């Protein structure tokens, strides 16, 4: 299973449920990488989707502890259940938020990390894969600058 996330220099990923700084290059990268894949997302992150609708061109899976139906989503109630669905998919990607990343990281072997070179005041963080001996940066896929902010799209693999 794979995951995709944008992190700031301090590995922050958001504040109060939103991305303080979002780059159009990262949004494009996200669309390219997730198109056609199964995406696993938390219920609170769905609230940030346009119209709270499923992402088009993807199989949308919501991971939540709540017993609920979400139109357009397959709802699962445990990381194990999400991982099992992911194993049966051609490609499955964890797309957040913070709690879902923490729960699903043990099931992932590939991480697409956009490093955004700034440090806004985050309250939610992704584990620092550079400090984790179980993960290795294998490739910088793309780099650039947008609105004066540098970024790199990086590929990490579990070793």
State where each predicted segment sits.
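Enzymes that bind and transform nitrogen-containing heteroaromatic metabolites
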Residues: 1-159
């Amino acid at each position: 299973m794979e995951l995709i996330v944008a992190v700031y220099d301090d590995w922050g990923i958001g504040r109060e449920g939103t991305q303080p700084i979002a780059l159009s290059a990262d949004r494009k990268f996200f669309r390219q990488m997730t198109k056609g894949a199964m995406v696993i997302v938390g219920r609170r992150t769905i609230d940030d989707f346009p119209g709270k609708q499923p992402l088009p061109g993807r199989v949308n899976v919501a991971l939540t502890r709540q017993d609920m139906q979400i139109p357009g989503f397959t709802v699962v109630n445990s990381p194990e259940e999400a991982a099992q669905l992911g194993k049966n998919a051609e490609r499955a990607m964890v797309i957040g938020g913070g709690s879902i990343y923490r729960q699903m990281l043990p099931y992932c072997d590939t991480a697409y990390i956009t490093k955004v070179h700034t440090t806004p005041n985050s309250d939610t963080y992704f584990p620092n894969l550079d400090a984790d001996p179980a993960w290795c940066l294998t490739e910088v896929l793309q780099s650039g600058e947008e609105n004066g902010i540098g970024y790199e799209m990086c590929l990490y693999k579990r070793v």
